Amino acid sequence: MSLLQFSGLFVVWLLCTLFIATLTWFEFRRVRFNFNVFFSLLFLLTFFFGFPLTSVLVFRFDVGVAPPEILLQALLSAGCFYAVYYVTYKTRLRKRVADVPRRPLFTMNRVETNLTWVILMGIALVSVGIFFMHNGFLLFRLNSYSQIFSSEVSGVALKRFFYFFIPAMLVVYFLRQDSKAWLFFLVSTVAFGLLTYMIVGGTRANIIIAFAIFLFIGIIRGWISLWMLAAAGVLGIVGMFWLALKRYGMNVSGDEAFYTFLYLTRDTFSPWENLALLLQNYDNIDFQGLAPIVRDFYVFIPSWLWPGRPSMVLNSANYFTWEVLNNHSGLAISPTLIGSLVVMGGALFIPLGAIVVGLIIKWFDWLYELGNRETNRYKAAILHSFCFGAIFNMIVLAREGLDSFVSRVVFFIVVFGACLMIAKLLYWLFESAGLIHKRTKSSLRTQVEG
């Protein structure tokens, strides 16, 4: 890449970054937080944060990258995607009408809400316990990170339930919403994330998500400022780099440490070059249609229920890894959101996907606002826990693609909804047995005096 070519790419990158950052800033000033703000920051991180890192790798370490015209296509496709997404998100689908009382879809009380977070936490802890009994601490047993996907590891399906510890702790926080509950959320979820990091063998997702939710709650409540958020972001990048070194068993120093930091940080937070690689091989792609979305559900079907279930699921990430890159190392390489759309239907699917994503984020913001307006604090805690708990799925959306997002968000909704139903059923059984006693002012006063 020549300096002239880099200059042209830099101008496009700067214009796209300023365009998205400006719209995000205006939205932040208007509402302080919603899921449009979160997705916009996530989109910036995924598709634009990596460009400066790539530039340093090219000019400082002479690392080979895709041709400049392909990198330009990647930047422009990301910028155009966001423009279509933003217009879709801001388009009002129906006329604003005055709020009229409606019969609520469901209600929550204190006992049902507490039962819900206990069940969610129980699912996570029991899953971790069973996985640990089968495999021990994989971080200290395996020689390479790719081995966690091998046949040596049993009970892999249990990992999908680990994440429900975070929604459980979110319910606990939203029931109190003070600084102590906020700090308790951070300590409990990060400690759990570190535990799963050691047990699973290097998976950092729970730590990243817990830290991100903690920061956004702090921004919403005004407990941290923007400069504190930026400082925490830098700390998070350094922390993720250190965990990556431990995961891959690397011991580096000097120039090698700087080089390793650049490419690991780029691959962790901003795999935009994967989109460029996909576009570089555009003519070799056999468009998959909506099949990757259907195939991604295969992993949730037990083998005893479907004996002939394919052992290898050809979703967009695996198609990109195996068919496009011819990489069979055992690790799936993230195609990114836009890359998954290209795999499914080529360039035509990019604006269509942007419209779909705009509607998805719009729905989450509608649900979030519903929680903000809810007068029943127990129901509000459940709604907010569901919305913030889905942040993991939005990260999957930006990094892994639309197919991975759809299967995971459906799984999340089913498990979360099942926990709600079980909590309500248990409450009904306890109430029928006479074990539930309503609190009265006199009993509360007696407890305080006693």
Swiss-Prot record:
Q: Which residues cross the membrane?
A: 6-26, 37-57, 63-83, 118-138, 155-175, 181-201, 207-227, 228-248, 341-361, 378-398, 410-430
Query: Under which pathway is this protein filed?
Result: Bacterial outer membrane biogenesis; enterobacterial common antigen biosynthesis
Q: What is its main location?
A: membrane
What is its membrane topology? Multi-pass membrane protein
List UniProt keywords, sorted A-Z. Cell inner membrane, Cell membrane, Membrane, Transmembrane, Transmembrane helix
Q: How does it assemble?
A: Probably part of a complex composed of WzxE, WzyE and WzzE.
Name-wise, this protein is Probable ECA polymerase
Q: Which organism is it from?
A: Escherichia coli O139:H28 (strain E24377A / ETEC)
Taxonomic path: Bacteria, Pseudomonadati, Pseudomonadota, Gammaproteobacteria, Enterobacterales
